[in-house]
């Protein structure tokens, strides 16, 4: 039989292991990289934050990278980027759904490592100094919007078609019911 002392040590180790697992393995974090692909001597200033975390300002020299760990279960992260003379060009965007972001002269590019075998296959997302609603949206974002609109319109069409068919079926059955009632009435005379 296990002594009480050994049992308490075993329970303590088990509880400690569960606590460590809940802080590491069970809370999934993914990496977000922001890279400066601007021309020579054109630094990039990055300020990433969320409602609970402020990652302070970082200055990236050309070809430099900034790494951010984002917890999937936590709040929404977004980043401000500034570049150009006196850092007058600016853009802000959400980074929760992206693995690699590149700042280039014409705007911000995006790529997901798990889908892009070649890291040079980035998609243009946002232009500098352009509001997000006016900026060229990513093909991924437009696909999601168009697919959701298509899906919702198909669902609405399906319900409309079912409603029309049920109404036609009801009218057809109602006509048959009238004919049966008239036939019974005439037969009973």
Curated annotation (Swiss-Prot):
Residues 1-25 form the signal peptide. It is found in: Secreted. Keywords: Secreted, Self-incompatibility, Signal. The keyword Repeat does not apply. Its main location: secreted. It comes from the Eukaryota. Belongs to the plant self-incompatibility (S1) protein family. The keyword Secreted applies. GO terms for cellular component: extracellular region. GO terms for biological process: rejection of self pollen. InterPro entries: Self-incomp_S1 (IPR010264). This is S-protein homolog 26. Pfam families: Self-incomp_S1 (PF05938).
């Amino acid at each position: 039989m296990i002594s009480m002392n050994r049992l308490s040590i075993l329970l303590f180790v088990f509880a400690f292991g569960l606590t460590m697992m809940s802080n590491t393995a069970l809370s999934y974090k993914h990496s977000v990289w922001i890279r400066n692909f601007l021309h020579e001597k054109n630094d990039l200033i990055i300020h990433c934050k969320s409602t609970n975390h402020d990652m302070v300002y970082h200055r990236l020299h050309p070809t430099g990278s900034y790494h951010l760990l984002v917890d999937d279960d936590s709040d929404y992260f977004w980043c401000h980027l500034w570049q150009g003379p006196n850092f007058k060009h600016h853009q802000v965007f959400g980074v929760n759904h992206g693995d690699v972001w590149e700042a280039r002269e014409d705007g911000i590019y995006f790529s997901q490592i798990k889908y892009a075998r070649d890291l040079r296959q980035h998609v243009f997302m946002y232009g500098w100094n352009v509001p997000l609603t006016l900026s060229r949206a990513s093909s991924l974002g437009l696909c999601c919007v168009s697919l959701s609109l298509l899906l919702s319109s198909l669902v609405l069409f399906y319900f409309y078609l079912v409603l029309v068919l049920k109404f036609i079926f009801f009218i057809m059955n109602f006509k048959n019911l009238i004919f049966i009632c008239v036939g019974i009435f005439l037969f009973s005379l």
